[in-house]
Amino acid sequence: LGGIVLSLDLPTGRRLWEKDFATDQTSWIAGDWVFQLSTDQQLAALSADTGQVKWARQLPPFKNMKKLTQPIYWWGPVLAGSSLVLVSNDKQLATVNPTTGEITNIIPLPAPAAAPPIAAEGKVFVTLATGDLLALG
């Protein structure tokens, strides 16, 4: 997959910047930063003003890294409190420091996630492949 992430000036439609970045996830914009997850499971923080990459963090892309089998698919990120939150089809919820990109916690889920997490009312909601909805926080 190919693709770009870009910033537009809404009143004029003028393209401010663009980055080659294959993604199928929605960007999360917070303050001066755009947080984006690529199709190869790399999470990045881009400057909203310039598109410059502040940090990039590779999330685990495979369960078996030696054989490169059993792909892990991540959804997100969303900003919940002071952490970025992502979920995976490998029954994991990851929290990431938005300033440094450091993975601060991996929390097991009872089943694979099936969609991006949602942050609302001080909680993170996770839809599982079983059809259950978890409310965390």
Language-model regions, residue ranges each:
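Hydrophilic extracytoplasmic domains
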Residues: 88, 98-137
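Solenoidal tandem-repeat scaffolds enriched in leucines and small polar residues
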Residues: 1-17
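Short loop/turn segments that connect beta-strands within beta-propeller blades
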Residues: 9-12, 47-50, 97-101, 137
